[in-house]
Amino acid sequence: MSFKKVFPAVLVVTLALSGCSAVKNLLPSKESTNFLNGTNAKNGPVLVVKIDDTTQAHPQIGLEDADVVYIEQVEGGLTRLAAVFSSVIPQRIGPVRSARISDIDIVSQYGRVAFAYSGAQRKFLPVIEAANLEDLGAQHEGSSIYTTDPNRTPPYAMVLRADLLMKKISDRNLVIDTAKDIGFVFSDKNDGGVPTDKAVMHWPAATYSANWSESEKRWLLSHNNQPDIAESGVHLGPTTLVIQMVSITPSEYKDKLGGVTPLSHTIGSGKAYVLRNGELFAGSWNRTSAESGTTFAMPNGDPINFAAGQVWIALTDREPDFTSRPSNNSK
């Protein structure tokens, strides 16, 4: 059963009983266009879930319903995902893994979000508690919400019952912001692109590739040279793929094996590549503060328009590779 079907009824009952203004923040706004994906969908409360991205964690659960997915570097040069849900919140999401320091700045531009994760380094927990988010980590919730999938092997078996978590948020009258403008501009087209078939993104111990599908009008992903297929059987792939070039530096935190946690710097400015509709747009990104959104612009200052639909943002400090094609075969 999906959140989209259950949640409004829960809200009606809760509001009738409590009349609490905090709960009203969980009501999807009346906007006809979702700020995060540009489609004709409501702007619901924002849930961010940390998801394991190792080979053992695949196939992942629920990512096909995310509005935005961030790929971030973690210890050992591996990647981990931060999935942002608003328009639709699926029943199950996972496998859930622990939070990292890069998450704080990534999620702050969304306002006060519901933040779901498996745990964190003890030294880092006070930072999460002090951040402008609702800390809903597994250490605070029961096993009925952070479940164990019997068909998976720990630590790749924790699966979030997102529907139950959102009901608990309503029952507790917690304040969660609905989706808002975070800098994305959506349009049917964007001029000045280079026809492109494929992009390859690099991290020290992981790779992603994206191949343009003319029939599906999206970039079909592969993870470590294997098709990125969700548990549902859906081939994961966004309509807009952003490669955001960032500085990645060692942080003061370490994992339980002593590996230094990298910090991806997402406040500031830098180079960006945006892929949509089978074309590549080279430009820049800019973000002035933790609370402000991230904008993407062409060299002349015009915004780079995203295509309506799911957005993936790869945070990396390594230049990607692109395979272009003759312009008369584009789109």
Q: Residue spans of the language-model regions?
A:
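Bacterial N-terminal signal peptides that target proteins for export
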Residues: 1-7
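C-terminal motif of bacterial Sec signal peptides marking the signal peptidase cleavage site
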Residues: 17-19
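Bacterial signal peptide processing site
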Residues: 21-24
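A surface/extracellular/periplasmic glyco- and lipid-processing/surface-interacting theme
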Residues: 26-44, 48-68, 75-331
